[in-house]
Amino acid sequence: MSSIKPAAKKLRLAKAGKQNRRVPMFVIAKTGGKVRTHTKMRNWRRNTLKK
């Protein structure tokens, strides 16, 4: 991808990068290990973002 990109695309990529985090440890501890993953985890190679 080019380094020069539209602002809207840059914002979308930044938001997707922030959302792509694991479940916090305190949530795993609070739920007794029942909640370990969330469905919005995305791998840059496997899943694509909407244009």
From Swiss-Prot:
Keyword Plastid included in the entry's annotation: no
Single annotated GO MF: structural constituent of ribosome
GO BP annotations listed: translation
One Pfam family, short name: Ribosomal_L39
InterPro entries assigned: Ribosomal_eL39 (IPR000077), Ribosomal_eL39_CS (IPR020083), Ribosomal_eL39_dom_sf (IPR023626)
Domain of life: Archaea
Keywords of the record: Ribonucleoprotein, Ribosomal protein
Ribosomal protein as UniProt keyword: yes
A cellular component term, taken from the record's GO annotations: ribonucleoprotein complex
Gene3D superfamilies: Ribosomal protein L39e
HAMAP family: Ribosomal_eL39 (MF_00629)
Family: Belongs to the eukaryotic ribosomal protein eL39 family.
UniProt protein name: Large ribosomal subunit protein eL39
Organism: Methanococcus aeolicus (strain ATCC BAA-1280 / DSM 17508 / OCM 812 / Nankai-3)
The gene coding this protein: rpl39e
